[in-house]
Amino acid sequence: MTQRQRGKSARHELGLRALKPALRAVVKAGRLTVIGAHATRLVIDSGSPGPSVAIKLHSAALPFKLLSRPSLALGEAYMDGSLTVEDGSIRDLLAIVTSGLDGLDELPIERLRAPLARIATRLTGNRRRKAARNVARHYDLSNEFYALFLDEDWQYSCAYFCEGCSSLEDAQAAKRSHIGQKLMVGEGMSVLDIGCGWGGLAIELAKQGAAEVLGISLSQEQLTLARQRAEEAGFAEEARFDFCDYRDLQGEFDRIVSVGMFEHVGPASYGSFFRAIEEHLAPDGVAVVHSIGRMAPPGGKDPWVDKYIFPGGYIPSLSETLSVVERMGLWVTDIEILRLHYAETLAHWYERFQSRREKALELFDERFCRMWEYYLAACEMMFRNGNLMVFQLQLAHKRDAVPLTREYLYAPRDQSAVPRDAGGNHLRCSCSARSRLLGTSNSEGVPPMRYDGSSTS
């Protein structure tokens, strides 16, 4: 071995030694073997059940990058090939390194970095032009790409795995139904869908009897397909889709729903978001906001996700969300926390993506596909092992806008769509049918896919 080779080997060995305390802190399940470029090895055995994974680091600098910015460095290393999984899968690796995330918080560098990240996040907001740019970057990738792993209704948000759901399609249909129960859409009502995606929920609400549904989005790709789907379903007049920022809305709506959009708003714009709901919701109206959240105090953004997946995005805590709702004077009539439902959803997406990976490579390059593998697997494990969850907020102007108890959420649809009294009369939630779509100012029961470390994808 030459002197230069010995120097490189020493740097790799030094890097692995520096990495060892951090790995011991976070690996609380399974066994991880880290191989340096010159065959130096580090083995971390948790002594607890879990996957056995071997990874190879192809750069002497990588251990130090992993220590300084773990999330960003790990994601980029996998994308670029400077970290390869020699035994197991990226999903296995992420299951191991997220098994003890509390230990990461105790490392000195994390104690220094976390407060700075929180301060920077407080300033995060998305003005109109920036919001449109950020949305386009993610959602305008290609409808053909999203079709590779989404269900047949194009639902790109957490499914609802109720008893009897045997597939992703079933669980996404259950999600639409569950949100519909909370909205209590009656015949002739007007509905606003903020961040309507590819139109699945809006079209479903039109089918349930809504006279007019306006879906708004900042993604041209989504809007094009949503309009096409409404036309094909025969509901093009009832379900309309516009390119519009929620801050530019006009009119009043009996029902307002927003699924998977609040994560893109940013703390500095929370007031604008809930003010829009307060101003555009009818006096007897009901709104439902469905969002990824963190079961922890407000924190920072994930640097890898912010750079590569959702620029400008931020996962809100329930506390910072509700404090803004309170200032708007809205009643929080129901809160539901979905704990593992998104982990199961992401597991389905990951398996579907892997099974159609060759198709993805026809659309994008290998680095892009590795990025999405990492994204789907990392998100799944953060719902399984981290502090992520989903919350659904039901909001209203009046305390009696919805029934006194939650039985109506689980009653057969024909009994709960519009609650009635003993005489068959509509209760408070029966807003009168008003055509207010005035346009815009600028045109847990089913056996789950539990992760047991057996994935070979």
Spans of features found by a protein language model:
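Feature captures hydrophobic
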Residues: 1-173, 178
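Conserved SAM-binding loop of SAM-dependent methyltransferases across substrates and taxa
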Residues: 198-209
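Conserved SAM-binding strand-loop segment of SAM-dependent methyltransferases
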Residues: 233-246
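Conserved beta-strand signature within the Rossmann-like core of class I S-adenosyl-L-methionine
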Residues: 284-292
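A short acidic, Gly/Pro-enriched loop at the edge of an enzyme's catalytic core
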Residues: 247-256
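Substrate-binding/catalytic lobe of Class I Rossmann-like enzymes that use SAM or dcSAM, i.e.
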Residues: 292-403, 417-420
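Conserved class I S-adenosyl-L-methionine
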Residues: 187-195
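A short glycine-rich, Lys/Arg-flanked "PGG" loop and its adjoining helix->strand segment in the class I
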Residues: 271-283
